[in-house]
Swiss-Prot record:
It is found in: Cell membrane. It comes from Shigella flexneri. The gene is spaP. Belongs to the FliP/MopC/SpaP family. This is Surface presentation of antigens protein SpaP. The lineage of its organism: Bacteria, Pseudomonadati, Pseudomonadota, Gammaproteobacteria, Enterobacterales. Keywords: Cell membrane, Membrane, Plasmid, Transmembrane, Transmembrane helix, Virulence.
Length: 216
């Protein structure tokens, strides 16, 4: 039988799980990049949001699989007790070490230091100075870092499509076809180029390789 604290911890975990997946994994970057690519192509609802989010979730699970397995093994090798709040905090610091290393690796450390200092308020800053960040300071810093990186990637992906739009607009203007919408011509051209270059495959591989070293 689970103790009251263990039951509360279990229910809290499953309640917060969707938010942890959305903000505490690489899903946040994948979903933003995919939506920005769709917008850059000039498409509104194709692929649908559900499709893009599903692909982003599957890719995120693929990347996070070793970390999830390591956390589960630490839990099994315990034994772990969740009778008090301190037990839960202790497990988050020791049992989730692989996850903390993942967060730290892909986090802007300046943001992590800011949240660590804010968490400690005006107390001793020794842990932040020794690069020993708590899980609760790494999570917001990681989420903001992933959003920033996703916007950077989206900017570079937008550039070639903007060039195509400008070229099509200039050609239509030179031909005197000012009444025709450039989108009518540019969207099919961008689609052909994107499919011919295997855009989805290249983009997906590049995103995954930011987290996993895959031999050629």
């Amino acid at each position: 039988m689970l103790s009251d604290m263990s039951l509360i911890a279990t229910l809290s975990f499953f309640t917060l799980l969707p938010f942890l997946v959305a903000a505490g994994t690489c899903y946040i970057k994948f979903s933003i990049v995919f939506v920005m690519v769709r917008n850059a192509l000039g498409l509104q609802q194709v692929p649908s949001n559900m499709t893009l989010n599903g692909i982003a979730l599957i890719m995120a699970l693929f990347v996070m699989k070793p970390i999830i397995e390591a956390g589960y093994e630490n839990y099994l090798n315990g034994p772990q007790k969740f009778d008090t709040i301190s037990d839960i905090v202790r497990f988050s610091d020791s049992g989730l070490m692989e996850y903390k290393q993942y967060l730290k690796k892909h986090t802007d450390l300046e943001l992590a230091r800011f949240f660590q200092r804010s968490e400690e308020e005006n107390a001793d800053l020794k842990s932040a100075e020794n690069n020993d960040y708590s899980l609760f300071s790494l999570l917001p810093a990681y989420a903001l870092s992933e959003i920033k990186d996703a916007f950077k990637i989206g900017f570079y992906l937008y550039l070639p499509f903007v060039v195509v739009d400008l070229v099509i607009s200039s050609i239509l203007l030179a031909l005197g076809m000012m009444m025709m919408s450039p989108i009518t011509i540019s969207v099919p051209i961008k689609l052909v180029l994107f499919v011919a270059l295997d855009g989805w495959g290249i983009l997906s591989k590049a995103l995954i390789e930011q987290y996993i070293n895959i031999p050629a």
